[in-house]
Amino acid sequence: MNPLILSMILTTLAMGTMATMLSSNWLLAWMGLEMNMLAMIPILTMNPNPRSTEAATKYFLTQATASMLLMMAIMINFMLSGQWSITKLPNTTVSSMALAALMMKLGLAPFHFWVPEVTQGTSLTSGMILLTWQKLAPLSILYQIDTSVDITILTVSGLLSILVGGWGGLNQTQLRKILAYSSIAHMGWMLIIMPYNPSLTILNLLIYILMTLSIFMIMMNNHSTSTLTLALLWNKAPMMMILLTITLLSLGGLPPLSGFMPKWLIIHELTKNDSIILPMSMAMFALLNLYFYMRLIYSSSLTMFPSTNNMKMKWHFTNRSHLTLLPPLIILSTLTLPLTPFLSILE
């Protein structure tokens, strides 16, 4: 793609997200979401082939449906209340329609079916943007309307997302699909805690983005897209394999890594609100995710590939200039658990 066109597309993508995040007006927020969607489609088809075209079509149809539903909710809300403010959703039907539209945009269950298919059909770079940056705009709107929506819908959808995110990834061999199901599960955790403590949603999102970026950068560096290609990584780049293993364990929420912090704080917050069955169910469903992360680690680092590699340090001689961000990302996504006591300052 022409660098000038690519820079224009990325600028539009960033402007759309920022417009939605900074807006308290429904129309401006909706316009930001539309800019975001239209800029994402050429990114999905950056490497033109039938798979990417199909993925872009699925993405467009899903997002357009969600945008139409959201606009309908906005117009009904204006007819009833006479104002465009995002925080004013007096009607339960309107808030449920807006919530359904945002859940569809985020890929939350039961509107999650498009996420694995679209992620698998695109390049690693497009998939990385889809599973990280594209979550910001819809979540910022959800953050503003969390007091107006039904907490039961949030809880049921969140639990279903955690279950689907764990169950769907069990038989997968494609890394992009595994990360897509991981995204669905993490979004479920964020959705459940939002009515109780929205700050924990932001913390969870931040750590999730750091971990996902780290994994995608390692995959892009080694051109790994499946468990078969990942099995070669131990011979080609042992240090990258170690970093990937640690980051996957962090993504699964194992202590003493960073991924344990948001899960621990969310379960603690729910328990403080006299909820016992809900956090217990969330923790049990999260074991499904941990299982397929462990299976991924076992197949790639604890089994030797049946071939010899006479040049063990081949990876030292390749160009690593594009990996400047990887060390700080790895540190932030694995070693921030000791900072947990300082989070009390934010409360």
Curated annotation (Swiss-Prot):
An example Gene Ontology biological process: mitochondrial electron transport, NADH to ubiquinone
InterPro entries, alphabetized: Complex_I_Subunit_2, NADH_DH_su2_C, NADH_UbQ_OxRdtase_chain2, ND/Mrp_TM
TM segment ranges: 26-46, 60-80, 96-116, 123-143, 151-171, 178-198, 200-220, 240-260, 274-294, 325-345
One MF term in the entry's GO annotations: NADH dehydrogenase (ubiquinone) activity
Bilayer topology: Multi-pass membrane protein
GO cellular component, one term: mitochondrial inner membrane
Catalytic activity: a ubiquinone + NADH + 5 H(+)(in) = a ubiquinol + NAD(+) + 4 H(+)(out)
Intracellular or extracellular location(s): Mitochondrion inner membrane
Highest taxon in the source lineage: Eukaryota
Keywords of this entry: Electron transport, Membrane, Mitochondrion, Mitochondrion inner membrane, NAD, Respiratory chain, Translocase, Transmembrane, Transmembrane helix, Transport, Ubiquinone
EC number, as in UniProt: 7.1.1.2
Main location (coarse class): mitochondrion
PANTHER family, per the entry: NADH-UBIQUINONE OXIDOREDUCTASE CHAIN 2 (PTHR46552:SF1)
Family: Belongs to the complex I subunit 2 family.
Quaternary structure and partners: Core subunit of respiratory chain NADH dehydrogenase (Complex I) which is composed of 45 different subunits. Interacts with TMEM242.
Protein's job: Core subunit of the mitochondrial membrane respiratory chain NADH dehydrogenase (Complex I) which catalyzes electron transfer from NADH through the respiratory chain, using ubiquinone as an electron acceptor. Essential for the catalytic activity and assembly of complex I.
Protein name per the record: NADH-ubiquinone oxidoreductase chain 2
The species this protein was found in: Dugong dugon
Species lineage: Eukaryota, Metazoa, Chordata, Craniata, Vertebrata
Gene field: MT-ND2
